[in-house]
Protein backbone atom coordinates (compact mmCIF):
# COMPACT_ATOMS: atom_id res chain seq x y z
CA UNK A 1 0.00 0.00 0.00
CA UNK A 2 1.03 3.59 -0.72
CA UNK A 3 0.30 6.35 1.77
CA UNK A 4 0.30 10.01 0.75
CA UNK A 5 0.18 12.70 3.44
CA UNK A 6 -0.81 16.18 2.30
CA UNK A 7 1.23 18.82 4.13
CA UNK A 8 1.60 21.72 1.71
CA UNK A 9 -0.94 24.21 3.07
CA UNK A 10 -0.10 27.70 4.29
CA UNK A 11 -2.23 27.67 7.45
CA UNK A 12 -3.03 31.38 7.34
CA UNK A 13 -5.42 31.21 10.28
CA UNK A 14 -2.61 29.98 12.52
CA UNK A 15 -1.09 33.47 12.22
CA UNK A 16 2.39 32.04 12.51
CA UNK A 17 5.61 31.85 10.50
CA UNK A 18 5.82 28.17 11.42
CA UNK A 19 4.23 25.85 8.82
CA UNK A 20 0.90 24.62 10.14
CA UNK A 21 1.84 20.93 10.15
CA UNK A 22 4.86 21.67 12.36
CA UNK A 23 2.89 23.16 15.22
CA UNK A 24 3.30 20.85 18.20
CA UNK A 25 0.66 18.63 19.70
CA UNK A 26 1.77 16.65 22.75
CA UNK A 27 5.35 17.70 22.15
CA UNK A 28 5.75 16.70 18.51
CA UNK A 29 4.64 18.21 15.19
CA UNK A 30 1.14 17.50 13.95
CA UNK A 31 2.67 15.88 10.88
CA UNK A 32 4.82 13.56 13.00
CA UNK A 33 1.68 12.12 14.61
CA UNK A 34 0.24 11.35 11.18
CA UNK A 35 3.49 9.75 10.00
CA UNK A 36 3.68 7.60 13.13
CA UNK A 37 0.14 6.35 12.53
CA UNK A 38 0.87 5.73 8.86
CA UNK A 39 3.90 3.61 9.73
CA UNK A 40 1.75 1.19 11.72
CA UNK A 41 0.04 0.26 8.44
CA UNK A 42 3.43 -0.76 6.98
CA UNK A 43 3.19 1.07 3.63
CA UNK A 44 5.64 0.23 0.86
CA UNK A 45 5.76 3.91 -0.12
CA UNK A 46 5.21 6.80 2.31
CA UNK A 47 5.13 10.20 0.59
CA UNK A 48 4.67 13.61 2.20
CA UNK A 49 3.55 16.39 -0.14
CA UNK A 50 5.17 19.66 0.94
CA UNK A 51 4.75 23.23 -0.25
CA UNK A 52 4.65 26.15 2.18
CA UNK A 53 7.78 25.97 4.35
CA UNK A 54 8.92 22.90 2.45
CA UNK A 55 12.50 22.87 3.74
CA UNK A 56 11.44 23.25 7.36
CA UNK A 57 8.94 20.43 6.97
CA UNK A 58 11.51 18.17 5.32
CA UNK A 59 14.01 18.82 8.08
CA UNK A 60 11.48 18.17 10.84
CA UNK A 61 10.29 14.75 9.67
CA UNK A 62 13.12 13.47 7.46
CA UNK A 63 13.58 9.70 7.75
CA UNK A 64 14.77 6.87 5.49
CA UNK A 65 11.21 5.65 4.91
CA UNK A 66 9.75 9.08 4.07
CA UNK A 67 9.79 10.51 0.54
CA UNK A 68 8.82 14.04 -0.39
CA UNK A 69 6.89 15.49 -3.30
CA UNK A 70 6.57 19.24 -3.84
CA UNK A 71 3.39 21.17 -4.62
CA UNK A 72 4.78 24.49 -5.79
CA UNK A 73 1.35 26.12 -6.03
CA UNK A 74 -1.47 25.20 -3.67
CA UNK A 75 -4.09 24.36 -6.31
CA UNK A 76 -6.17 21.94 -4.26
CA UNK A 77 -6.06 18.45 -2.81
CA UNK A 78 -6.41 16.71 -6.16
CA UNK A 79 -3.45 18.64 -7.53
CA UNK A 80 -1.45 17.83 -4.38
CA UNK A 81 -1.95 14.08 -4.75
CA UNK A 82 -0.92 14.35 -8.41
CA UNK A 83 2.52 15.55 -7.31
CA UNK A 84 3.04 12.33 -5.36
CA UNK A 85 1.99 9.92 -8.12
CA UNK A 86 5.47 9.43 -9.68
CA UNK A 87 6.73 8.13 -6.32
CA UNK A 88 3.97 5.54 -5.83
CA UNK A 89 3.55 1.90 -6.76
CA UNK A 90 0.78 1.98 -9.39
CA UNK A 91 -0.22 -1.61 -8.68
CA UNK A 92 -1.02 -0.96 -5.00
CA UNK A 93 -3.84 1.11 -3.50
CA UNK A 94 -3.11 4.59 -2.18
CA UNK A 95 -4.36 5.93 1.14
CA UNK A 96 -4.53 9.75 1.36
CA UNK A 97 -4.09 11.38 4.78
CA UNK A 98 -3.69 14.96 6.00
CA UNK A 99 -0.80 16.40 7.95
CA UNK A 100 -3.09 18.54 10.09
CA UNK A 101 -5.39 15.69 11.19
CA UNK A 102 -3.27 14.06 13.90
CA UNK A 103 -5.62 11.91 15.99
CA UNK A 104 -6.97 9.32 13.55
CA UNK A 105 -6.54 5.82 14.96
CA UNK A 106 -4.60 3.27 12.95
CA UNK A 107 -7.50 0.82 13.41
CA UNK A 108 -9.86 3.27 11.73
CA UNK A 109 -7.60 3.49 8.69
CA UNK A 110 -7.12 -0.27 8.64
CA UNK A 111 -10.89 -0.76 8.57
CA UNK A 112 -11.21 1.66 5.65
CA UNK A 113 -8.52 -0.02 3.56
CA UNK A 114 -9.93 -3.48 4.27
CA UNK A 115 -13.42 -2.37 3.28
CA UNK A 116 -12.16 -0.92 -0.01
CA UNK A 117 -9.98 -3.90 -0.81
CA UNK A 118 -7.25 -3.94 -3.43
CA UNK A 119 -9.19 -2.21 -6.21
CA UNK A 120 -11.99 -0.33 -4.47
CA UNK A 121 -12.56 3.32 -3.61
CA UNK A 122 -13.13 4.04 0.06
CA UNK A 123 -14.04 7.26 1.85
CA UNK A 124 -13.85 7.90 5.58
CA UNK A 125 -16.98 9.81 6.58
CA UNK A 126 -18.48 11.02 9.84
CA UNK A 127 -21.94 12.21 10.82
CA UNK A 128 -21.93 15.52 12.69
CA UNK A 129 -24.61 17.44 14.56
CA UNK A 130 -23.18 20.58 12.96
CA UNK A 131 -21.62 19.77 9.57
CA UNK A 132 -20.90 23.41 8.72
CA UNK A 133 -17.74 23.93 6.69
CA UNK A 134 -17.40 20.36 5.46
CA UNK A 135 -18.07 18.64 2.15
CA UNK A 136 -21.32 16.66 2.19
CA UNK A 137 -21.75 13.01 1.19
CA UNK A 138 -24.55 12.88 -1.38
CA UNK A 139 -26.14 9.44 -1.71
CA UNK A 140 -28.55 8.09 -4.32
CA UNK A 141 -31.96 6.50 -3.72
CA UNK A 142 -30.30 3.18 -2.91
CA UNK A 143 -28.07 4.80 -0.28
CA UNK A 144 -24.91 4.51 -2.35
CA UNK A 145 -22.42 7.38 -2.55
CA UNK A 146 -23.16 9.48 -5.63
CA UNK A 147 -20.81 12.42 -5.11
CA UNK A 148 -19.16 14.70 -2.58
CA UNK A 149 -20.14 18.37 -2.62
CA UNK A 150 -18.00 21.01 -0.96
CA UNK A 151 -19.75 23.47 1.36
CA UNK A 152 -19.29 26.46 -0.95
CA UNK A 153 -20.73 24.55 -3.90
CA UNK A 154 -23.64 22.88 -2.07
CA UNK A 155 -27.33 23.62 -2.62
CA UNK A 156 -29.56 24.48 0.36
CA UNK A 157 -30.87 20.89 0.34
CA UNK A 158 -27.36 19.44 0.30
CA UNK A 159 -26.36 21.68 3.21
CA UNK A 160 -28.91 19.81 5.33
CA UNK A 161 -26.90 16.58 4.96
CA UNK A 162 -25.15 15.62 8.22
CA UNK A 163 -22.75 13.01 6.80
CA UNK A 164 -19.54 14.75 5.82
CA UNK A 165 -16.34 13.92 3.99
CA UNK A 166 -13.23 13.76 6.17
CA UNK A 167 -10.96 13.93 3.13
CA UNK A 168 -9.33 10.60 3.94
CA UNK A 169 -9.70 8.21 0.99
CA UNK A 170 -8.21 5.04 -0.41
CA UNK A 171 -8.23 4.30 -4.14
CA UNK A 172 -6.49 2.17 -6.79
CA UNK A 173 -3.42 4.19 -7.70
CA UNK A 174 -3.26 3.71 -11.46
CA UNK A 175 -6.92 4.63 -11.95
CA UNK A 176 -6.66 7.47 -9.42
CA UNK A 177 -3.91 8.99 -11.55
CA UNK A 178 -6.18 9.02 -14.60
CA UNK A 179 -9.06 10.54 -12.66
CA UNK A 180 -6.86 13.26 -11.18
CA UNK A 181 -5.55 14.18 -14.63
CA UNK A 182 -9.15 14.78 -15.72
CA UNK A 183 -10.10 17.05 -12.82
CA UNK A 184 -11.43 20.54 -13.51
CA UNK A 185 -11.31 23.59 -11.27
CA UNK A 186 -14.66 25.13 -12.21
CA UNK A 187 -15.79 25.55 -8.62
CA UNK A 188 -16.10 28.33 -6.05
CA UNK A 189 -12.52 27.84 -4.86
CA UNK A 190 -10.96 27.51 -8.30
CA UNK A 191 -9.15 24.39 -7.09
CA UNK A 192 -8.76 20.79 -8.21
CA UNK A 193 -10.74 18.83 -5.63
CA UNK A 194 -9.70 15.28 -4.79
CA UNK A 195 -13.35 14.69 -3.91
CA UNK A 196 -14.38 15.10 -7.57
CA UNK A 197 -12.64 11.80 -8.30
CA UNK A 198 -15.53 10.06 -6.53
CA UNK A 199 -17.92 10.72 -9.42
CA UNK A 200 -15.29 9.47 -11.88
CA UNK A 201 -14.89 6.27 -9.88
CA UNK A 202 -18.66 5.73 -9.92
CA UNK A 203 -18.78 6.39 -13.67
CA UNK A 204 -16.03 3.79 -14.06
CA UNK A 205 -18.26 1.23 -12.38
CA UNK A 206 -16.76 1.27 -8.88
CA UNK A 207 -18.97 1.35 -5.83
CA UNK A 208 -17.61 3.93 -3.41
CA UNK A 209 -17.65 2.41 0.07
CA UNK A 210 -17.52 4.29 3.35
CA UNK A 211 -16.55 3.64 6.94
CA UNK A 212 -16.81 5.86 10.00
CA UNK A 213 -14.43 6.29 12.94
CA UNK A 214 -15.37 5.26 16.45
CA UNK A 215 -15.07 8.87 17.66
CA UNK A 216 -15.66 12.18 15.89
CA UNK A 217 -12.41 13.66 17.18
CA UNK A 218 -10.41 11.21 15.06
CA UNK A 219 -11.14 13.32 12.00
CA UNK A 220 -10.75 16.79 13.49
CA UNK A 221 -8.19 18.99 11.75
CA UNK A 222 -6.23 22.03 12.84
CA UNK A 223 -6.77 25.37 11.13
CA UNK A 224 -6.37 27.74 14.07
CA UNK A 225 -4.67 27.99 17.45
CA UNK A 226 -8.07 27.44 19.07
CA UNK A 227 -8.49 24.13 17.26
CA UNK A 228 -4.93 23.16 18.12
CA UNK A 229 -5.66 23.75 21.80
CA UNK A 230 -8.87 21.72 21.56
CA UNK A 231 -7.07 18.76 20.01
CA UNK A 232 -4.32 18.98 22.63
CA UNK A 233 -6.91 18.59 25.38
CA UNK A 234 -8.63 15.72 23.56
CA UNK A 235 -5.32 13.94 23.17
CA UNK A 236 -4.30 14.49 26.79
CA UNK A 237 -7.70 13.27 27.97
CA UNK A 238 -7.21 10.09 25.95
CA UNK A 239 -3.73 9.56 27.40
CA UNK A 240 -4.93 10.14 30.95
CA UNK A 241 -7.85 7.79 30.45
CA UNK A 242 -5.52 5.04 29.21
CA UNK A 243 -3.29 5.51 32.27
CA UNK A 244 -6.28 5.25 34.60
CA UNK A 245 -7.44 2.07 32.89
CA UNK A 246 -3.91 0.68 33.35
CA UNK A 247 -4.12 1.31 37.10
CA UNK A 248 -2.19 4.57 37.47
CA UNK A 249 -3.52 6.95 40.13
CA UNK A 250 -3.94 10.50 38.80
CA UNK A 251 -4.85 13.21 41.30
CA UNK A 252 -6.59 15.11 38.48
CA UNK A 253 -6.62 13.60 34.97
CA UNK A 254 -7.28 17.06 33.50
CA UNK A 255 -4.02 18.40 34.91
CA UNK A 256 -1.53 16.02 33.30
CA UNK A 257 0.47 16.50 30.09
CA UNK A 258 2.26 13.63 28.38
CA UNK A 259 4.37 14.90 25.47
CA UNK A 260 5.90 11.63 24.39
CA UNK A 261 5.54 8.16 25.90
CA UNK A 262 4.96 7.40 29.57
CA UNK A 263 5.25 3.81 30.79
CA UNK A 264 4.09 3.09 34.33
CA UNK A 265 4.38 0.05 36.57
CA UNK A 266 1.89 -0.99 39.23
CA UNK A 267 0.63 1.42 41.89
CA UNK A 268 2.17 4.54 40.38
CA UNK A 269 0.73 7.82 41.69
CA UNK A 270 0.98 11.17 39.88
CA UNK A 271 -0.11 14.46 41.45
CA UNK A 272 -1.38 17.53 39.58
CA UNK A 273 0.32 19.70 36.95
CA UNK A 274 3.02 17.21 35.98
CA UNK A 275 4.57 17.19 32.50
CA UNK A 276 6.25 14.14 30.96
CA UNK A 277 8.30 14.61 27.80
CA UNK A 278 10.17 12.21 25.53
CA UNK A 279 10.40 8.64 26.86
CA UNK A 280 9.73 8.30 30.58
CA UNK A 281 9.46 5.08 32.58
CA UNK A 282 8.08 4.97 36.12
CA UNK A 283 8.57 1.62 37.85
CA UNK A 284 6.26 0.09 40.48
CA UNK A 285 5.19 2.24 43.44
CA UNK A 286 6.72 5.47 42.15
CA UNK A 287 5.12 8.62 43.54
CA UNK A 288 5.35 11.89 41.62
CA UNK A 289 4.49 15.07 43.51
CA UNK A 290 2.82 18.14 42.03
CA UNK A 291 4.33 20.44 39.40
CA UNK A 292 7.15 18.14 38.28
CA UNK A 293 8.68 18.07 34.79
CA UNK A 294 10.30 14.78 33.73
CA UNK A 295 11.94 14.27 30.35
CA UNK A 296 13.70 11.17 28.96
CA UNK A 297 14.21 9.49 32.32
CA UNK A 298 13.83 6.16 34.07
CA UNK A 299 12.65 6.22 37.69
CA UNK A 300 13.17 3.10 39.81
CA UNK A 301 10.64 1.27 41.96
CA UNK A 302 9.49 2.94 45.15
CA UNK A 303 11.14 6.26 44.41
CA UNK A 304 9.45 9.44 45.62
CA UNK A 305 9.72 12.61 43.55
CA UNK A 306 8.55 15.62 45.51
CA UNK A 307 7.03 18.86 44.23
CA UNK A 308 8.64 21.11 41.60
CA UNK A 309 11.39 18.65 40.71
CA UNK A 310 12.83 18.78 37.17
CA UNK A 311 14.44 15.67 35.71
CA UNK A 312 16.02 15.39 32.25
CA UNK A 313 18.08 12.58 30.76
CA UNK A 314 18.57 10.88 34.12
CA UNK A 315 18.54 7.38 35.59
CA UNK A 316 17.17 7.02 39.12
CA UNK A 317 17.36 3.80 41.11
CA UNK A 318 14.89 2.26 43.52
CA UNK A 319 13.64 3.87 46.75
CA UNK A 320 15.34 7.18 46.10
CA UNK A 321 13.97 10.51 47.32
CA UNK A 322 14.10 13.60 45.10
CA UNK A 323 13.08 17.16 45.85
CA UNK A 324 11.25 19.28 46.47
CA UNK A 325 12.83 21.71 43.99
CA UNK A 326 15.57 19.31 42.88
CA UNK A 327 17.03 19.29 39.38
CA UNK A 328 18.60 16.33 37.59
CA UNK A 329 20.26 17.23 34.30
CA UNK A 330 21.46 14.93 31.50
CA UNK A 331 23.90 12.27 32.61
CA UNK A 332 22.72 12.18 36.21
CA UNK A 333 22.64 8.64 37.61
CA UNK A 334 21.28 8.10 41.10
CA UNK A 335 21.63 4.67 42.66
CA UNK A 336 19.17 2.99 45.02
CA UNK A 337 18.17 4.80 48.22
CA UNK A 338 19.98 8.00 47.32
CA UNK A 339 18.59 11.39 48.29
CA UNK A 340 18.72 14.64 46.32
CA UNK A 341 16.93 17.39 48.20
CA UNK A 342 15.75 20.94 47.80
CA UNK A 343 17.73 23.22 45.50
CA UNK A 344 20.24 20.52 44.61
CA UNK A 345 21.40 20.22 40.99
CA UNK A 346 23.08 17.10 39.62
CA UNK A 347 24.59 17.01 36.13
CA UNK A 348 26.64 14.27 34.43
CA UNK A 349 27.32 12.68 37.80
CA UNK A 350 26.84 9.42 39.67
CA UNK A 351 25.45 9.38 43.21
CA UNK A 352 26.06 6.03 44.87
CA UNK A 353 23.72 3.86 46.91
CA UNK A 354 22.45 5.55 50.04
CA UNK A 355 24.33 8.79 49.39
CA UNK A 356 22.64 12.07 50.24
CA UNK A 357 22.80 15.65 49.05
CA UNK A 358 19.85 17.19 50.81
CA UNK A 359 20.30 20.95 50.53
CA UNK A 360 21.60 23.73 48.27
CA UNK A 361 24.27 21.84 46.35
CA UNK A 362 25.73 21.60 42.85
CA UNK A 363 27.19 18.24 41.80
CA UNK A 364 28.59 18.26 38.28
CA UNK A 365 30.92 15.87 36.44
CA UNK A 366 31.36 13.75 39.54
CA UNK A 367 31.53 10.12 40.66
CA UNK A 368 30.26 9.78 44.20
CA UNK A 369 30.37 6.46 46.01
CA UNK A 370 28.00 4.84 48.48
CA UNK A 371 26.86 6.27 51.82
CA UNK A 372 28.37 9.69 51.18
CA UNK A 373 26.95 12.73 52.93
CA UNK A 374 27.13 15.97 50.94
CA UNK A 375 26.58 18.95 53.24
CA UNK A 376 24.50 22.00 52.41
CA UNK A 377 26.14 24.54 50.13
CA UNK A 378 28.68 22.12 48.65
CA UNK A 379 29.90 22.95 45.14
CA UNK A 380 31.93 20.85 42.74
CA UNK A 381 34.03 23.39 40.83
CA UNK A 382 34.27 21.52 37.55
CA UNK A 383 34.86 24.22 34.93
CA UNK A 384 37.90 26.41 34.34
CA UNK A 385 36.32 28.46 31.57
CA UNK A 386 37.41 26.10 28.82
CA UNK A 387 37.45 22.53 30.15
CA UNK A 388 35.37 20.33 32.45
CA UNK A 389 37.04 18.14 35.09
CA UNK A 390 35.72 15.34 37.31
CA UNK A 391 35.45 15.09 41.06
CA UNK A 392 35.71 11.61 42.57
CA UNK A 393 34.40 10.95 46.07
CA UNK A 394 34.76 7.39 47.32
CA UNK A 395 32.49 5.46 49.72
CA UNK A 396 31.64 6.65 53.25
CA UNK A 397 32.98 10.18 52.85
CA UNK A 398 31.49 13.00 54.92
CA UNK A 399 31.51 16.37 53.18
CA UNK A 400 30.74 19.27 55.51
CA UNK A 401 28.61 22.26 54.62
CA UNK A 402 29.91 25.06 52.39
CA UNK A 403 32.66 22.93 50.84
CA UNK A 404 34.20 23.66 47.44
CA UNK A 405 35.80 20.76 45.59
CA UNK A 406 38.08 22.09 42.85
CA UNK A 407 38.33 19.45 40.13
CA UNK A 408 40.17 17.41 39.16
CA UNK A 409 40.27 16.03 42.68
CA UNK A 410 39.75 12.71 44.51
CA UNK A 411 38.52 12.23 48.06
CA UNK A 412 39.30 8.70 49.20
CA UNK A 413 37.21 6.30 51.25
CA UNK A 414 36.10 7.35 54.72
CA UNK A 415 37.58 10.85 54.62
CA UNK A 416 35.96 13.77 56.42
CA UNK A 417 35.91 17.30 55.02
CA UNK A 418 35.25 20.01 57.56
CA UNK A 419 32.68 22.72 56.93
CA UNK A 420 33.85 25.69 54.90
CA UNK A 421 36.79 23.86 53.33
CA UNK A 422 38.13 24.41 49.83
CA UNK A 423 39.61 21.14 48.55
CA UNK A 424 42.03 21.42 45.64
CA UNK A 425 44.31 18.47 46.43
CA UNK A 426 43.50 14.77 46.74
CA UNK A 427 42.41 13.65 50.22
CA UNK A 428 43.72 10.39 51.69
CA UNK A 429 41.45 7.68 53.09
CA UNK A 430 40.04 8.27 56.61
CA UNK A 431 41.71 11.69 56.79
CA UNK A 432 40.24 14.92 58.11
CA UNK A 433 40.81 17.88 55.86
CA UNK A 434 40.14 21.49 56.78
CA UNK A 435 41.41 24.95 55.93
CA UNK A 436 43.02 26.69 58.92
CA UNK A 437 41.13 29.87 59.59
CA UNK A 438 41.57 32.26 62.48
CA UNK A 439 38.47 33.65 64.11
CA UNK A 440 38.88 37.12 65.53
CA UNK A 441 36.46 38.73 68.00
CA UNK A 442 36.37 42.43 68.91
CA UNK A 443 34.49 43.31 72.07
CA UNK A 444 32.51 46.50 72.31
CA UNK A 445 32.14 46.79 68.55
CA UNK A 446 29.67 49.43 67.40
CA UNK A 447 27.91 48.76 64.15
CA UNK A 448 27.81 51.71 61.71
CA UNK A 449 24.46 53.45 61.38
CA UNK A 450 22.93 55.40 58.54
CA UNK A 451 22.92 59.15 58.83
CA UNK A 452 19.48 60.64 59.19
CA UNK A 453 18.61 63.18 56.51
Curated annotation (Swiss-Prot):
Pathway: Nucleotide-sugar biosynthesis; UDP-N-acetyl-alpha-D-glucosamine biosynthesis; N-acetyl-alpha-D-glucosamine 1-phosphate from alpha-D-glucosamine 6-phosphate (route II): step 2/2; Nucleotide-sugar biosynthesis; UDP-N-acetyl-alpha-D-glucosamine biosynthesis; UDP-N-acetyl-alpha-D-glucosamine from N-acetyl-alpha-D-glucosamine 1-phosphate: step 1/1; Bacterial outer membrane biogenesis; LPS lipid A biosynthesis. GO terms for biological process: cell morphogenesis; cell wall organization; lipid A biosynthetic process; peptidoglycan biosynthetic process; regulation of cell shape; UDP-N-acetylglucosamine biosynthetic process. It is an enzyme of class 2 (transferase). Binds 1 Mg(2+) ion per subunit. Residues 247-453 are annotated as: N-acetyltransferase. Residues 1-225 are annotated as: Pyrophosphorylase. Mg(2+) binds at residues 100, 223. One of its GO terms (cellular component) is cytoplasm. It is found in: Cytoplasm. In the N-terminal section; belongs to the N-acetylglucosamine-1-phosphate uridyltransferase family. Homotrimer. This is Bifunctional protein GlmU. The lineage of its organism: Bacteria, Pseudomonadati, Pseudomonadota, Betaproteobacteria, Burkholderiales. The gene is glmU.
Amino acid sequence: MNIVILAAGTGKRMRSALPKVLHPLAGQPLLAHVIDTARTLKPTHLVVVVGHGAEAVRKAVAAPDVQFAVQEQQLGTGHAVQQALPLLDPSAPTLVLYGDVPLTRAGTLQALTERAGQGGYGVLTVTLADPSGYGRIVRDAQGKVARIVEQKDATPEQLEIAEINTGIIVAPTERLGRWLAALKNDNAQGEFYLTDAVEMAIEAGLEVVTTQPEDEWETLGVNSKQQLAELERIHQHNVADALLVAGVTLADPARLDVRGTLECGRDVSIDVNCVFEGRVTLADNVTIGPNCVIRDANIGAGTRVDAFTHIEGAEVGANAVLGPYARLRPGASLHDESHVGNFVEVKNAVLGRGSKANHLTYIGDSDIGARVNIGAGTITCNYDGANKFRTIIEDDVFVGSDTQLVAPVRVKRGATIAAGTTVWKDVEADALVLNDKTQTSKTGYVRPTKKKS
